[in-house]
């Protein structure tokens, strides 16, 4: 048994147990190449590959994603060992925080995270929106924003801790917008989905239904 970095030659073996993870399938085949390029795509091998996870290291935080275990080898702490391996690398590089995004109905992953002393940090709602032509909206681009008020934003499904530089860069690219009506303000931070073309991921901070509607109209 060993944990090593995955290579392009491992893809076929991994995809055999990454097809029906969710009701709609899985996304691992779409991100495989980009995760290989980023590095830190860890593979648990027991004669054959039986588990993977990817780690994204950014400043003092670790983002652990894409944990997949062959169903024939579950309940053997393979996922826990992969996560611990990713954490150790982070600790050696002065990481202070480790995060995972887990569906609230994924009881097995929640149990695994709890067993490793992870705690629920925040609970978010996810909605999807299809494009629609609309030129009637009341929004403005934000030129400055406080990272204490908006401490995180989503980029390629990673909850990234904001910094002054990140927010300035996003503002320069017109990726922070707000709507202010009747003293209520909603703000949206637009992130890219690097692994899927023509897809945006938007972090919304809603102040009222009316201002949220204006932002959604613009995003469409």
Walk through the language-model features, giving the residues of each.
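Hydrophobic adenine-recognition pocket in adenosine-nucleotide-binding enzymes
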Residues: 6, 67-69, 102
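Active-site rim helix/loop that mediates acceptor-substrate recognition in acyltransferases
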Residues: 18-42, 49-54, 151-183
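Conserved beta-strand in the GNAT
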Residues: 48-56, 63, 68, 183-195
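Conserved active-site alpha-helix within GNAT-family acetyltransferase domains
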Residues: 80, 104-122
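Conserved GNAT acetyl-CoA-binding A-motif
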Residues: 90-105, 220
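Amide-forming acyltransferase catalytic core, primarily the GNAT-like/NAT-type
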Residues: 116-196
């Amino acid at each position: 048994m060993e944990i090593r970095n995955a290579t392009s030659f491992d893809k076929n073996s991994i995809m055999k147990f990454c097809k029906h993870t969710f009701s709609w399938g899985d996304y691992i085949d779409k991100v495989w190449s980009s995760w290989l390029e980023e590095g830190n795509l860890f593979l648990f091998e027991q004669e054959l590959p039986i588990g993977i996870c990817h780690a994204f290291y950014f400043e003092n935080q670790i983002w652990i994603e894409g944990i997949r275990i062959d169903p024939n080898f579950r309940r053997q702490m393979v996922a826990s060992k992969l996560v611990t391996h990713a954490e150790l690398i982070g600790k050696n590089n002065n990481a202070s925080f480790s995060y995972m995004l887990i569906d609230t109905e994924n009881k097995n992953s929640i149990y695994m995270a709890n067993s490793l002393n992870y705690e629920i940090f925040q609970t978010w709602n996810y909605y999807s929106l299809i494009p629609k032509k609309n030129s009637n909206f009341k929004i403005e681009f934000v030129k400055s924003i406080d990272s204490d008020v908006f401490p995180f934003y989503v980029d390629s499904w990673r909850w990234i801790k904001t910094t002054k530089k990140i927010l300035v860069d996003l503002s320069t690219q017109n990726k922070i917008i707000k709507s202010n009506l009747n003293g209520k303000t909603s703000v949206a931070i637009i992130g890219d989905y690097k692994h899927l073309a023509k897809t945006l991921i938007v972090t919304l901070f809603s102040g009222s239904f009316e201002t949220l509607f204006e932002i959604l109209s613009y995003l469409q």
